[in-house]
Curated annotation (Swiss-Prot):
Belongs to the DNA mismatch repair MutL/HexB family. SUPFAM superfamilies: ATPase domain of HSP90 chaperone/DNA topoisomerase II/histidine kinase, DNA mismatch repair protein MutL, Ribosomal protein S5 domain 2-like. HAMAP family: DNA_mis_repair (MF_00149). The keyword Cytoplasm does not apply. CDD domains: HATPase_MutL-MLH-PMS-like, MutL_Trans. The gene is mutL. One of its GO terms (molecular function) is ATP-dependent DNA damage sensor activity. This is DNA mismatch repair protein MutL. Keywords: DNA damage, DNA repair. Signal peptide: none annotated. The keyword DNA repair applies. It comes from the Bacteria. This protein is involved in the repair of mismatches in DNA. It is required for dam-dependent methyl-directed DNA mismatch repair. May act as a 'molecular matchmaker', a protein that promotes the formation of a stable complex between two or more DNA-binding proteins in an ATP-dependent manner without itself being part of a final effector complex.
Length: 624
């Protein structure tokens, strides 16, 4: 007698439900994707008890005939594909034909539907996958699916559901991710008889503001690039809007929400030193790609896609994000509050409105800030600035498809032409010849204060110089054009065993940077030449400190070798707080700073520039 037997359909469906239906949010995601595939222009989501008691999805899509409705709850019955070749051109969100039978097998399930042109609709009800009732009913065009008492017949699964607050959070994230991806659809959500939101217009900005706080969308940076292979569009958040989790990163491929480690890492790396450790940037990004170049059938919940050529996708994705970030001014406002995340308790009870309280400051370009500085400090004196693109007008919509573009991934202009040297200390009362410009000052030999067109700008001289040196070091190493000054008297440095190992690891890049070094004995190094930016007499201390910091960064931050070395070099070699600068040196530092690609933060993520507007000053003095 055969020991292997085919499982009954109701048992197979319950097993399948273990992968497809993990929690109420899984039910909602699958049903919403079906509604979108049915060309719905209006969708209403209703839940009770965080989806444990009730989940109901109402859409005005194409509806189904009686025959199609009955087939829809059969395993592997679908209208999305008919052959294996269809998987290569898949544009629908659903395609397996597993969701409805899996959901029906673990709930009290009801489907009511009516196609266009039919006089009556069809209603079908089943409990635990077993048919209970079917009838003709009056109905509007579209489909209504009601799921009650999820996992009522699988107590072990129901027991593992989390608290209502947790389950509601997952539900809301599922609905939000689709409402943002399909702004052309009217969305409404009701929880425990209270309306949470109702989006009647296709305004993506209205939705972002509703989800994250008033005027949130004003502080976002639009992204729009495309070529024959890939399109990228959407929005990026300012570094001040960072979160300590990646819940607020939405990446879509052909409008399908996905989780992709490669893209998430590329996004994180594109922000680079703008991010504080363990923080993640806000992102709402839509990637369009030929469906034949991806495989969406690699995850039970269809949350992952496999790219045919992942390297090419990253090669295009990373520079677009990097360039977009580099072209904007992220300097913090002096009166900005600390950005907040989701309000405490907001998701604990669905009767409260949801949202973030990020401070919405309209994004401006680096060239705008530099122009304000030049006009504030020098009036209408003409100035030259490396070519940065001005901020584009706020788009009326976002492209989520396959619009063509010619990518322009150029970097910013030359870094700088002047080398800063701290001058010898002078008494504070000693007048500086030529220091007659009243619009640039040094405060406590630590900060530079400048008048700008809109108010004032405060620059930390140490981290500003650090940013200049960092970008110069990266470029010099990558271009392999060392700029070294030879020492009249070579200096000898004794290294410990671990220091010498680090030295050997970075020796080639030290040469690229401008250090001319020669081994002299077991653990001794002769310094015969140094970079132009290193002050003679400091080379031994700087090299030793660089080796120490390089090792610390390697163990803590896992940085790429040249980035790590550039950080160490710039930090140890920058002018320090307490060093007096002449007016010309301050001007040179400011000009060099604004010629860098990212002038708003130092390589470690600390702010370089803080702005204080006239409006803020007026409010402080009670003028407004």
């Amino acid at each position: 007698m055969a020991k292997i037997a085919r499982l009954p359909d109701n048992v197979a469906n319950k097993i399948s439900a273990g992968e497809v239906v993990q929690r109420p949010a899984s039910v909602i995601k699958e049903l919403l994707e079906n509604a979108i595939d049915a060309c719905a222009s209006k969708i209403t989501v209703t839940i009770k008890d965080a989806g444990k008691e009730l989940v109901q999805i109402v859409d005005n899509g194409i509806g189904m005939s009686r025959q199609d409705a009955l087939l829809s709850v059969e395993r592997f019955a679908t209208s999305k594909i008919s052959g294996v070749e269809d998987l290569d051109s898949l544009m629908s969100l659903g395609f397996r034909g597993e969701a409805l039978p899996s959901i029906a097998s673990v709930s009290q399930f009801e489907l009511k539907t009516k196609p266009e042109g039919a006089l009556l609709g069809f209603r079908f009800r089943c409990d635990g996958g077993e048919p209970v009732e079917e009838s003709e009913v009056n109905a509007e065009k579209g489909t209504t699916i009601t799921v009650r008492n999820l996992f009522y017949n699988v107590p072990a699964r129901r027991k593992f559901l989390k608290s209502n607050a947790t389950e509601f959070r997952h539900i809301f994230e599922s609905v939000k991710s689709l409402a943002l991806a399909y702004p052309e659809i009217e969305w409404k959500m009701v929880s425990d008889d209270e309306e949470l939101f109702h989006f009647r217009t296709p305004d993506i900005y209205e939705r972002l503001d509703a989800f994250y706080g008033e005027n949130f969308s004003l502080s976002l940076i639009p992204v729009s690039e495309e070529n024959d292979y890939l399109s990228i569009s959407g929005f990026l958040g300012k570094p001040g809007m960072q979160k300590r989790q990646k819940l607020d990163q939405y990446i879509y491929v052909n409008r399908r929400i996905i989780q992709n480690r490669m893209l998430s890492q590329a996004l994180q790396q594109a922000y680079g030193e703008l991010l504080v450790e363990r923080q993640a940037p806000f992102a709402l990004l839509f990637l369009g790609i030929d469906p034949s170049r991806i495989d969406v059938n690699v995850h039970p919940a269809k949350l992952e896609v496999k790219f045919e050529d992942e390297r090419s996708v990253r090669t295009m994705f990373y520079p677009v994000i990097k360039r977009t970030i580099q072209l904007h001014d992220f300097s913090p406002d002096a009166a900005e509050k600390e950005p907040c995340s989701i309000k405490e308790g907001t998701l604990d009870c669905s009767s409260r409105k949801l949202g973030f309280q990020d401070i919405a400051e309209p994004a401006s370009t680096t060239s705008t800030l530099y122009a304000n500085y030049r006009q504030g400090a020098f009036g209408d004196t003409p100035f030259e600035r490396p070519a940065y693109a001005e901020k584009e007008p706020r788009p009326s919509s976002i492209n989520t498809g396959f619009e063509r573009f010619e990518p322009d991934l150029r970097e910013g202009g030359d870094l700088f032409s002047t080398t800063l040297q701290a001058r010898p200390y002078e008494d504070d009362n000693t007048p500086d010849p030529g220091e007659n410009d009243p619009k640039i000052w040094q405060l406590h030999n630590k900060y530079i204060i400048c008048q700008i067109k809109t108010g004032m700008m405060i620059i930390d001289q140490h981290v500003a110089h650090e940013r200049v040196l960092y970008e110069r070091a990266v470029d010099v190493m990558n271009q392999n054009v060392p700029n070294s000054q030879q020492l009249l008297f070579p200096q000898k440095i004794e290294l410990r065993a671990w220091e010498y190992e680090v030295f050997e690891e970075i020796r080639d890049d030290l040469y690229r940077l401008g250090f001319n070094l020669r081994s002299f004995g077991a653990k001794t190094v002769m310094i015969e030449g140094i970079p132009q930016d290193v002050r003679p007499g400091t080379e031994v201390t700087i090299l030793q400190d660089m080796i120490t910091e390089f090792q610390e960064n390697s163990s803590k931050l896992k940085l790429e070798r040249r980035e790590n070395l550039a950080r160490s070099y710039s930090c140890r070699n920058a002018i320090m707080a307490g060093q007096k600068l002449s007016l010309e040196e301050m001007r040179s530092l400011i000009d060099n700073l604004f010629a860098t690609r990212v002038p708003y933060t130092c390589p470690h993520g600390r702010p370089v520039i803080i702005k204080l507007s006239l409006d803020q000053l007026d409010r402080m003095f009670g003028r407004k």
